């Protein structure tokens, strides 16, 4: 299991300047909640799992997107990817992979989708495989180059309405 990380120590900011609502969301009882999930091993080391808002709850399982993305990046067809949760009436959410393909790989190939799904099933726990796979030219990113998963989720919601 993993949990949300938080901290309280000298030198930590005490507020988001000029943003009281954001401050209220992030600080509780003097602790700053990072929005990250991590787990601690037997030796006391902490391991990053992913962002709290990027944890997928599928059929009672909690799936960290970072782990699934790490597996997908090992597949030869994948240059870049983002994993998000997609609403599902039975499972709550399912794993969705948005993938930028490597040169010479063609999107729209059902066999490629099956191969990617099989690869994830064989590399990590089978319930973590992406039930939805979407191929895109590029992933939305911030100016600093971080993938904007929130934009992917918003785009998916727009498509489904």
Tell me the role of every PLM-derived stretch.
Residues 133-136:
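General small-molecule cofactor/ligand-binding pocket signal
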